[in-house]
A protein has these predicted regions:
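Small-molecule kinase domains that catalyze NTP-dependent phosphoryl transfer to phosphate-bearing small molecules
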Residues: 121-164
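Conserved phosphate-donor/acceptor-positioning beta-strand/loop module used by diverse small-molecule
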Residues: 99-119
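ATP-binding Walker
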Residues: 11
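Conserved substrate/cofactor phosphate-moiety recognition/catalytic segment
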Residues: 17-64
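Glycine-rich phosphate-binding loop used to anchor ATP phosphates in small-molecule kinases
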Residues: 54-103
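P-loop (Walker A) phosphate-binding loop of NTP-binding proteins
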Residues: 8
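Hydrophobic anchor at the beta1->P-loop junction of P-loop NTPases
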Residues: 5
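Walker A/P-loop
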Residues: 14
Length: 169
């Protein structure tokens, strides 16, 4: 099973993924950001894009790696990654589903005040950081994403949220 954890920057995707990992069968955390950083770091500046989702190679590489991992790995796969574009869902998640690969696509919900508190008040981000500036775009996806199982994260611990996700199986 693949568990894709989508949500706004600062919602706690990675923390929830780490709490979820021991609750699943031999779970592996797959990090699409590593692929994105590798692609972006090796492209010249004139090919730089604002988000990894704008690189067709990022979409294709994540799809292929997740398919390969699912076919070869004896365990669950947890993917904590924000997707802002509908086309990214189609290019990765829908393709995997169309091939019969089981997936739980979860959107971790939070309001703007909670997200800012988690990022700014904790000292992880500056008020003018890229992640904070993109909160409105993330919230627009949160309200529009009809593909996902939505889980409210406000006032909840990562352990509590991860238990709810683990119970989805």
């Amino acid at each position: 099973m693949i568990y894709w954890l989508n949500g706004a920057y600062g919602v706690g995707k990675t923390t929830v993924a780490e709490a979820l990992q021991p609750q699943l069968h031999n779970a592996h955390i797959f990090d699409p950001e590593l692929i994105g950083n590798g692609i972006r770091d090796n492209y010249p500046a004139n090919l730089f894009r604002e988000t990894f989702e704008e690189y067709p190679l990022w979409l294709e590489t994540n799809y292929r790696l997740l398919k390969d991992l699912y076919e070869r790995y004896e365990g669950d796969i947890v993917v904590p990654m924000t997707l802002l574009r509908e086309g990214s869902y189609a290019a990765i998640i829908q393709r995997l589903l169309d091939e019969g690969i089981p997936m739980k696509y979860v959107y971790l919900d939070a309001d703007e005040a909670t997200l800012k508190h988690r990022m700014i008040d904790s000292g992880r981000e500056e008020p003018d950081s890229w992640c904070v500036r993109h909160i409105p775009a993330c919230l627009a996806v949160q309200t529009a994403d009809t593909h996902a199982i939505h889980i409210d994260t406000v006032g909840r611990t990562p352990e509590d949220i991860s238990q709810e996700i683990a119970a989805l199986t």
